[in-house]
């Protein structure tokens, strides 16, 4: 299935976002039912195209066809030049995207950045910091507007990670970005805003969602983050499966991780399962996204989750693996509202999450991984400002 403006998510997926830390090639991410044969280096924004199934083109059923009947598959990245082959339906704009655009002067989006740096409104800012913040906001939105012209679905905009522990500033930043989008005639229903899953970020999500502004919570590494974000009404919650697994291989002492290991479960996959069951058992509206997928079995083990961000190497393997017709239904939908209804939660897990309970429940894994993610995003934002400082004013000013 493809995401559309009528879905509860169209992201950058949703994705960043840069989701993965790889080389330096400017790229974009797609969610599709077909896989592109490119060797890619870095993910910048996510684009979600609607591509034909191999069933229609070859008459064969592949593993990819089978898994996409249960979950939205979000391939890692493809280059900008493939818009015509794989028309995107949704996208994300982020600091990493701005860095990539500035590294390629000939890209179609460079004009959007140059126009932001030429904006007279920013020149009148009271301080150099305010002026730079204005430039970055304008650049994000200008690129987002260009992307909105290319996609029928939603454009997700990353909120500065340096605001992660300040609810009011997160809300103000989103309002500022939303105002700029409105001035350029992009309606709120076309937008998502990506916010780190700190307690303050979750509170910002609660306030924004109450205004009808959709949020995408990222860096969720523990059940308390997921449950609190779901209670806040976040539209999308993203879990990084592989990063939790990596942490567990090299660390110990996290009660949540240790409990899953004692049950013989992978901590990342276990969190996705628990999060999905909680959301569906208790009627929350949030959609769940699984990222940092490391192998095909990861995909098979969480079929039924709303979105799975999957590296192209794995997707290519899924596409190249033909499934005989009599095996089509051997792929089991592991997650479903029906199975969620039978899942049991402890009394402690069913609390109305407040800041005290939230911070008490955050274990070493979630604290360390959240901190690392925030530092990475903050570094990208700082690099954008430094780069803008070097290239401002642009040649046409």
Residue spans of the language-model regions?
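C-terminal extensions of enzymes
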Residues: 335-397
């Amino acid at each position: 299935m493809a995401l559309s403006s009528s879905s509860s998510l169209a992201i950058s997926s949703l994705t960043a976002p840069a989701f993965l830390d790889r080389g330096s090639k400017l790229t974009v991410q797609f969610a599709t039912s077909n896989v592109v044969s490119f060797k890619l280096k870095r993910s910048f924004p996510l684009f979600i195209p609607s591509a034909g199934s191999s069933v229609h083109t070859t008459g064969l059923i592949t593993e990819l066809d089978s898994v996409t009947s249960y979950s939205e598959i979000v391939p890692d990245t493809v280059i900008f030049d493939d818009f015509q082959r794989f028309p995107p339906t949704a996208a994300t704009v982020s600091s990493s995207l701005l860095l990539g655009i500035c590294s390629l002067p000939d890209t179609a989006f460079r004009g959007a950045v140059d126009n932001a740096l030429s904006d007279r409104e920013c020149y009148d800012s009271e301080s150099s910091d305010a002026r730079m913040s204005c430039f970055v906001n304008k650049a994000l939105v200008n690129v987002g507007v260009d992307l909105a012209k290319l996609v029928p679905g939603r454009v997700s905009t990353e909120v500065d990670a340096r605001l992660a522990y300040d609810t009011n500033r997160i809300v103000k930043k989103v309002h500022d970005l939303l105002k700029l989008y409105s001035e350029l005639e992009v309606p709120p229903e076309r937008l998502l805003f990506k916010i780190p899953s700190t307690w303050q970020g979750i509170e910002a999500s609660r306030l924004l969602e109450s205004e009808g502004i959709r949020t995408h919570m990222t860096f969720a590494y523990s059940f308390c983050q997921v449950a609190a974000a779901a209670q806040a009404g976040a539209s999308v919650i993203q879990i990084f499966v592989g990063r939790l697994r990596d942490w567990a291989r090299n660390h110990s002492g996290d009660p949540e991780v240790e409990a899953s290991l004692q049950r013989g479960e992978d901590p990342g996959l276990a969190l996705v399962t628990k999060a999905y069951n909680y959301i569906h058992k208790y009627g929350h509206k949030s959609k769940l996204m699984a990222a940092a997928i490391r192998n095909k079995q990861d995909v098979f083990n969480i079929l039924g989750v709303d979105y799975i961000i999957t590296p192209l190497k794995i997707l290519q393997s899924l596409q190249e693996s033909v499934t005989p017709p009599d095996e089509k239904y051997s792929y089991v939908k592991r997650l479903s509202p029906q199975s969620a209804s039978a899942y049991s939660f402890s009394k402690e897990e069913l609390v109305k999450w407040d800041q005290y309970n939230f911070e008490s429940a955050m274990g070493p894994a979630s604290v360390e991984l959240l901190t690392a993610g925030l530092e990475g995003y903050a570094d990208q934002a700082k690099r954008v400002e430094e780069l803008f400082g070097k290239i401002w004013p642009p040649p046409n000013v």
